[in-house]
Amino acid sequence: MNNKEIIQAIKEARENAKERKFTESLDLVINLKGLNLKKEDEKILAFIPLPHQRGKKVKVTALIDQALVTKAKADCDEHALLEDFKKLDKKAIKKLAKRTDYFVAQANIMPKVAQTFGRVLGPRGMMPNPKAGCVVPPTADLKPLVARLQNLVRIETKNEQTI
């Protein structure tokens, strides 16, 4: 299918649908053919920026040390300082992961982030990802990153050829 056919199909679906009393959303399902997902190099992990924001506000948590604490307090929904990592147990990390959509981490403390949060965030696919721009230097400005994460969506194939 080309872009015009896809846009036309979406327009028809929206026009023919009956009026709802809630905010509707569209789900896009893509079937991929000719991929062997048992091979690591054929798996897909991409972060795609959308032209408009998603329906809800994306919650961002910063995992930082003292260098970014003022910027994180101003721009992110929550933050965890390097000094507080030792106080966090597995239960607290799970609660934090439930209420967070993206984690942003400072690059120079990534080994400590992986050591503390890796067992909980790793299997959930929530570790700070450099592909999404979630691993930042100690001098980074978090405001444009948080704004970009509001429009970002993650696409991943695990064991099925459907996205």
Describe each PLM feature range:
Residues 1-2:
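Short, Lys/Arg-enriched, disordered terminal segments
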Residues 16-70, 91:
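Translation machinery proteins
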Residues 82-163:
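Long, charge-patterned amphipathic alpha-helical coiled-coil/hairpin "stalk" segments used as oligomerization
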Residues 8-16:
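Interdomain regulatory linker/hinge segments that flank or connect interaction modules
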Residues 75-81:
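Active-site regions of enzymes building and remodeling cell-envelope glycoconjugates
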Residues 69-75, 95:
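Short loop/helix-cap segments at secondary-structure boundaries that form the rim of catalytic
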